Amino acid sequence: MSQVSGGKVPSYHAPPFDSPLSGATIHELRCLDTKVQLGFHLVPHIAKTLITELPSSAYVLVTDTNLAKLGAIDKFRKAFEAIPGARLLVYELAPGEESKSRETKAAIEDWMLEHRLTRDTVVLACGGGVIGDLVGFVAATFMRGLKYVQIPTTLLAMVDSSVGGKTAIDHPHGKNLIGAFHQPRYVFIDAAWLLTLPEREFSNGMAEVIKTAAIWDAADFEKLESESASIRAAVMGDEARQQSAAQGHTLATRTSSQSLLLDVIRGSVGVKAHIVTIDEKETGLRNLVNFGHSVGHAIEAVLTPDILHGECVAVGMVLEAEIARLVHGLPQVAIGRLVRCLRLYNLPVTLADARIMALSKVRELTTARVLDIMRVDKKNAGAQKKIVLLSRIGATVEERASTVSDAMIERVLAPAMLVRESVSAPRPPLTIHTPGSKSVSNRALVLAALSGGTCRLRHLLHSDDTQVMMQALAQLRAADFAWEDNGATLVVHGQGGRVLASDEPVYLQNAGTAARFVTAVACLASSASCSGSDESSCHGVVHLTGNARMKQRPIGPLVDALRSNGARIDYVEQSNCLPLNVTASGALQGGRIELAADVSSQYVSAVLLCAPYAQNDVELALVGGKVISQPYIDMTIAMMQSFGVRVERVAEHVYRIPRTTYVAPSTYEVECDASSATYPLAIAAITGTTVTVPSLGRASLQGDAAFARKVLAPMGCQVEQNDVSTTVTGPPVGMLKALGAIDMESMTDAFITAAMLFAVATAPCDEYASSSTSASPSSTRITGIANQRVKECDRLRAVVTELAKLGVRAVEHDDGIEVFSTPISQLLPHASIYCYDDHRIAMAFSVLACVVPGAGTEIQEKRCVEKTWPSWWDVLGGPLNVPIAGARLNDALVSLVARSRQRGPPTPTTLYGRDASIVLIGMRASGKSHVGRSLAKLLHRTFVDADVVFSDMYDIGAFVQDHGWDAFRAEESRILESLLTQCSVGHVIALGGGVIESAASRALLARFREHVGPVVHIVRDFALIESFLATSDRPAYGEPLADVYARRLPLYAESSCMEAVNTGNDAALALSRQLRTPLGTPVPISPAFFLSLTFPRVQDAWSILDHASAGVDVLELRVDLLHADGQPSIDDVREQVALLRQYTSLPILYTVRSVSQGGRLPDEANEAYFALTRLGLRMGCEYVDIELTRPSDGIEELAQAKGQTRIVASFHDTSGTMHWMAPAMRRLYTRACVLGDIAKLVGFARTWQDSLDLESFRTRVAQEAPFPLIAINMQAAGQLSRIVNPLLTPVTHPALPVPAAPGQMSVRDIHHARHLLGLLPKRHFFLFGSPITHSQSPLIHNTAFELLGLPHVYARHETDSVDASVEALVRAGDFGGASVTIPHKLSIMQLLDSVSPHAQVIGAVNTIVPHRDETTGHMALHGENTDWRAIVDLVAKHDGGRTRACTALVIGAGGSARAALYAMHKLGASRILLYNRTFEKAVNLAEQVPVEWRVEPVDSLALAAKAKPNVIVSNVPAQGTSFTPGGADIVLPLDLLSSDGGVAIDMAYRPEITPLLTLAQQHQSWHGVRGIEILLAQAFHQFRLWTGLPPPCLDIETTVYAAYRAAAASM
C-alpha cells in the first residue's frame, strides 16, 4: 500500500467548534467541496446555516411519511419559521425502496414545477438512503442542476450514501441503474436521529462503519471491538432514549457514549471523504469502500427487502475475507476478529444466521446465481471479477479491487467441495501448521475468565467453538476480551470468578464443550440486579440454549451432579438436554460431588474448572463405570495447575479441589490441536508422502498426540516424534496395514481419521493378527469409542453409513466399529458424503477422498470444518496439493435443513427410474410378502423374498447357533447388498423384519432410497400383527413383541422413504397408485379443478364420490377435518389415505389447514403440522399443500423433501386485511414461487372491486414473473375469481354436505358462468360415418356436456364419403372435434394437418382434435386413435397383472384388428396370435404390421386354444361366431379360455352378451368386456382430448346403459 492507505481527509483532524449561528458543537469534514457537519440535535443549526450560506427563494424539504409521523416536518417548519423571510415547502413520500423509481421522480418534478420553483431552489433530502439517492437525482436533473443538502437520518445513510455524491433511481432490471454524480453542498449528520431507529437499523449502519475500519484503520477497528457496549448505549440504551431534547447539542452536555458514537461515525465518514476526494468517479481507489459489497450485493439482490443492505454486506465481508485467506493468505485471526466485531453489533456473519434461514428465498442463493449476479459489477474488468481483498485488519492487498477467478470464488461459496484423487501428484516433504487446540483453547478461556487480572492467550484457536465460548463468557460478564499483535494474542481481563446472569439467552450453537463448561460456570452466577449484601438473596436466571442438534446431546449427568451440590437447574424442553434454566444463586456448596463420567469427560472438566469457587473444598468422585477419555481430565488438571490451583488425586477416580481462586499467568501458549493434526498426518500415510506438524509432540497434554505412534506406526508408517514435533512418512500407496483390533479410548476424537485409513489398509499386520477379534484378516475393529455416538452426531453410525457410499463395509458394535478394508482401485467414485454438520466427518472423509479413483468425491456441508479448522480447505488445496473444487454450484449455499436435524423421516427423491425396483420393509407379519407378490403382478415385475434367498443358502437356525447374531446380520447385509445391486430394476424385494437392526443394512437401504428406488415401510395395525403371530409357527423373538416393535419402528421410518398401510386385499392396488408419484411421470402443473372432501372419514364419501367428483382432476383430502380438534393421529391419517387410494385412482391433494388459514389445526401446533404434512410426502400424494405462514425452516424442509410431489404453496387471507395490490401480496407470491410448484393465494372479497384487483394482480405477475398461480377470492363477491382462475380451482358439489370454503362453486356452475362471460364459446362436435343412426356417441358426449355445464353440442353427420360437407364442418370456426367411424377412418386423414404416431402405425383415425393458436386464430386438425387405448385400459383393469409377456389372441383381420394388435403389443404380449376365417387375410395383416409386434397367423382356433391365451379380442360381428359348426362362420372351441384367468373382449356392439362373452361367463377366472364398454372407454378418451376435462364416467354409463338396453328391448 502507498501512503494513501490509512489516512483520512485532513479536516478530520480539526477540533470541533461551537457554531456562531446556533451554538451547537460541530465537527466538520470536507469531501471535495462538500461540508460534512456532525453533531446532535442540529435542526435549528441546519436552518440557520442554509439561510446564511445558501440563500434561496425557496427551500424544499423532501422526507417520508414515517419521519413525518416522528415530527421531522414540524421541527423543520418551526426552525424555518423562526427565521424571517424563509420559505419552506414540504413534499412527503411513501417510505421504502419502491419509491426510488422513475414514477416518483417524475411526481416530485411535476410538483416542483407546479410550485413555480426556479434554479435557485435548495433541496433538502431528509431521510435514509432511498430519500438521499432519489432527491439527489432530482436535484441533479431539475433545471440542469439545483443545490441540495443531505440530511441523513439512518446510520447507514450517514456513513455511506450521503457522502460522495452518488445519486440514482432503480429500474426493474436492477438497483441504481439510472443516476448521476452530483455533490451536495452540505451533509448534516445529526446523530440524534439515531434515537428514532430500531436496533436492527442501527446495526445495519454499523456494518458500513466496521467496513471502513477493516479496510483502512486498525485503530478504529480496535475501538469498535473494545467499546461496542458504549457505542450502542449512546442511542440504543434506555438511558439514551430518555435523554433531554438537547442532550449532546453542545460538548458540555455530551455524554462519553455520545462522543464515542460520533467519533466512530466521524472516522468512517473521514475515510470515505478521503477516498472520494482522491477518486471521485470511482476509477480505482474508491473501489475499496466496496469491501463486502461484491458478494454482499449479490446476496442482497436475492434477499431484499427482507434482509437489509448492511446485513448483506456483513455476510459479504466475511465471505470476501475468506476469499482473501484463500487467494492471499489473510490470517484466520483477522477473519475471527472481523466475525466477532460484526457479532458485537448483532449483524449476521453467515448465511446460516437464523434471520436469513427464516427466509424461503435463501434457497435461491446458489453459487451459480451469486456468480451470475456478480458478473454485473462496476468494479469488474470485462469478464474478470474484482473483489476487495484484505491483507490484514486495516489494510488491503491492493489500493483497488483485485482480480479473483471464478474457481476461487466457487471454492469459498459452494456448499460442497469436490476432492479429487491426488496420489499421482508428487509432493516434497511438507510442514503443516495446525490451529490451536480446541480443547486447550476452551479450557484456557474459562480459566483466564475465572482468574483475577490479565492473561494473554497466544495461538488460540479462532473457530466457531471458541467464538461461542468467548461470547458466552462475555455475555455472563465473566471476562472482557481485547486483541493485541494484530489479533495474534487475545487479552483476557478476568473477573476473578464474578459471573452475572444475562437477560438474553446464552446461545451455544452446537458447541458441546462450551455447553458443558458454561453450564457449570452459570452455577457461579449472581443476578445482575443484585448488589452488596443482598446479592445472595436475589436470583436471576441464566437461560442456556443451542441449535437442534445441541438439544439432542446429553448433559444429564452434569446437571445431576451440579443439582446435588445446590445448583438450581431446570430443563426447559426434554430432560437431560439443553435448553436449561440455571438460577443465579452465586456459588456451589462444595463438599462431595458424585458424577457419572462414563459418557463424557467434559462433565468432569466442567466441575473441575469451577470447583475452586465453591463455598467449600470439593471432593469429586467419578462413579458409574469406566471413565471416558481420561487424558482430557488429566489435561484439565494440568492446566488448572498452570493457573495456580493444584488438584489432588486422593484415589483412582476421586479428586480434591481446594476452595481458592485462579491466578492467571501473564501469558499462556495454546498448543496446536492434536485431533486436527491427525488429518495432514493421515494424508501423509495414505498418499505415501512426508508431513511434519510442529508444536505437537510427546509432551502434549492431548491424548490424540499419540495418534502417530499408536496408529500410524503399526500401520506401516515411519514416525519421528520428539517433545515438540511429529513427522510421518507413509508407505507406498495401498500398503497400509490393518491392525485387527485397537482400543482408541484415549484418543476418541481421532477414531474417524483412523477409520479412513483402515478402509484401505489391505495388508494384514502380523503383530496384531493374533489378537484380532475380527473375522477378517484385513479388517480392524476400533473399541473404546462408544461416547462418540453423542458428539455432533452419532459418529459411529455416520462413519458406517458414509463409508458404504464409497464401497467400504463397516459394522457397528456397542463400543465401536469394525472396518473391512477395500483395495483403493475398488473404491466407488462419484460418492457424495453427507457430513451431519460434523467437522471431523468432513475433514476425515476428505483424507480418504484423496485416493478414491475417478472424477472425485463430494464432501457436503463443507463449512462445518469452521468449528475447529476454518482454513482446512485452503490447506488441503494449497500446501497439501490435493485437487479440489467447489461443488453443487446450483444448490443453495446453505443447507436449510440438514438431515441430522430433520423433523421427520426421509421422503422419495427425484432420481428413480420408472422401472426402479421397490424394496418393502416392515415387521414380521406386516404383510410384506403378500403385498409384494400382488404388487409385482400389478406392476409386471419380478418378486424376490430376501428371507427365501437366505434360507436357500443356509439353515438360518443353524447359522445363528454356529456363528451368532452379529454374523447373521453381517451375512444378511451381504445378501442385501447383492440383491440391491443385481436386482436394482424391475423387481419388488421384500426384506426380513429385522434387517434394519444392522447399521450396515440401514446404510445400504439409505443409499438405495437416495439414489436408486423407493424403500417402502409396510405398516399394519400392531394388534393384527400380534394376533397373527400368536397363532403362527414362526420362531419367537426371545423378548416381548411390543418391545421389538417399539425398538424397530423408528428404524423402519429412518430406513424408508415411503409408507403404505396393509388394510387388506386392496393394499397392493393402493400402493401401486401411491408409487405413481416417485416412479411415474410427474402429475401436470395445471389440472383444471380439485374437489375438496369435507368428511370426517373418507368412507363417508364413498356413496357419493363418483358423482361428486365428476369433471374434477384431483381430490383434496382435508387432513385437518379428520378430527374435531384438527389434529388426527398419524396412524389415522395413514389409514385414510390408503382407503382413499383403494377407492379412487384420482390424484390426491393433501392439505393440513390451520385455523388462521381457514382450517381446524391450531396455529401454534407446528410440530403436528409438519409431521402430518411430511406424512403426505411419504404417502406419495401427488400434490401437497404447504402454508406460507408456517415457520420458514420447516416449510423449506418440506419443499426440499418433495421428490416428485407437486407443492402447492398457499396463503389464505381469512381476515380480509390483505389487499391484492399491496407489496406484501407480491412478496407472498414471490415466496410461493420459490417454495412451490404452484402458488395459491386466496383473498377475501367484500366488493366487486376486490375481484377486479385480483385480476389486475394475476395479469401483472403473469407478465413480469409468470408462474402457475391459483388466485381466488372467498365469499360470493369473489366468485368471479373462481370463474376465471385457470388451474386447480377448488370446487364443491351439491352432493357434499358443505362447501370447503365460502363462495365455492361447482364445476357445472363455473362452466355456465364462463360461457356467459364469453370465456367458454360454444363448440360443435360431430360423428362422421355410415351407418350411424343407432350410435350411442351423441348420447355419451351430450350427456357429459350437460352434466359439466359445457355449452357444446354433439351431432351425427352421416355420409358415405369424406366429401365437401365434412370439410366444411371441420374447417368451421366453431368446430370442436369429431369422432370418425367406418368407412372413413383412413380417408379422413386427407383433411388432417397431423396424425399421432399411434394412429399412423394402426392406419386408422377415429378422433379429430382441433388445435387452436390463441394468438393467430389458426386451427390445425390433429388425428388420434382411441380404440387401442380403450382396449388397453379395460385389459389392465381386469387382468390382475397377467398380461406382461403373455399370449394374446386377436380374432378377425378387418379394419379394427390393427388397433387390437397394437393394443396387445403395448400391453407387452410376448406372442400375438391372429385368426381370421380367411387365413390369407390373417397372413397379409401379420406381414403388414411391424415384426416386433410378434404377430403369428393361425389357421385354427383349436390350435390357438392350445397356446392358452390370456387375452382374447374378437373383431368380428357377434352373429359370425357360435359354439357349434354350422351356427356361424367362426366356431369358438369350448376350451378356448383354458388358461388360468384372463380377459375376453368382444368389440361387437350388439348383442350385449355375445358367444365369446358367454364363454367368459362360464369361467370364473375370466373377465368379459362388452362392446358397449369399449365404446364408452374410447369416448372417454375423446372427451378428455377435446375438453381437457375428465368425463363424468359413472353418470354417463348409467344414462347410456339405460338407453342401450331400452333400444335392445325394442328390437
From Swiss-Prot:
Source organism, top-level taxon: Eukaryota
Cofactor annotation remark: Binds 2 Zn(2+) ions per subunit.
Region (Shikimate dehydrogenase): 1322-1611
Subcellular location: Cytoplasm
Keyword check for Metal-binding: yes
Pfam family, one: DHquinase_I
Region entry EPSP synthase, spans: 419-882
Gene Ontology cellular-component terms listed: cytoplasm
CDD domains: DHQase_I, DHQS, EPSP_synthase, NAD_bind_Shikimate_DH, SK
Residues noted as binding Zn(2+) in the record, renumbered to the chain: 208, 293, 309
UniProt pathway: Metabolic intermediate biosynthesis; chorismate biosynthesis; chorismate from D-erythrose 4-phosphate and phosphoenolpyruvate: step 2/7; Metabolic intermediate biosynthesis; chorismate biosynthesis; chorismate from D-erythrose 4-phosphate and phosphoenolpyruvate: step 3/7; Metabolic intermediate biosynthesis; chorismate biosynthesis; chorismate from D-erythrose 4-phosphate and phosphoenolpyruvate: step 4/7; Metabolic intermediate biosynthesis; chorismate biosynthesis; chorismate from D-erythrose 4-phosphate and phosphoenolpyruvate: step 5/7
Residues reported in the UniProt entry to bind ATP: 922-929
Keyword Ligase carried by entry: no
Active-site residues, Swiss-Prot/TrEMBL: 282 (proton acceptor), 297 (proton acceptor), 864 (for epsp synthase activity), 1212 (proton acceptor), 1240 (schiff-base intermediate with substrate)
Catalytic activity: 7-phospho-2-dehydro-3-deoxy-D-arabino-heptonate = 3-dehydroquinate + phosphate; 3-dehydroquinate = 3-dehydroshikimate + H2O; shikimate + NADP(+) = 3-dehydroshikimate + NADPH + H(+); shikimate + ATP = 3-phosphoshikimate + ADP + H(+)
Region feature Shikimate kinase, mapped onto this chain: 915-1092
GO biological processes: amino acid biosynthetic process; aromatic amino acid family biosynthetic process; chorismate biosynthetic process
Region span, 3-dehydroquinase: 1093-1309
EC number: 4.2.3.4, 2.5.1.19, 2.7.1.71, 4.2.1.10
Cofactors named for this entry: Zn(2+)
Residues noted as binding 7-phospho-2-dehydro-3-deoxy-D-arabino-heptonate in the record, renumbered to the chain: 144, 160, 166, 176, 208-211, 272, 286-290, 293, 309, 378
Positions contributing to NAD(+) binding: 64-66, 97-100, 128-130, 133, 153-154, 175, 193-196, 204
HAMAP family per record: EPSP_synth, Pentafunct_AroM, Shikimate_kinase
Protein family membership: In the N-terminal section; belongs to the sugar phosphate cyclases superfamily. Dehydroquinate synthase family.
Protein name per UniProt: Pentafunctional AROM polypeptide
Annotated source species: Malassezia globosa (strain ATCC MYA-4612 / CBS 7966) (Dandruff-associated fungus)
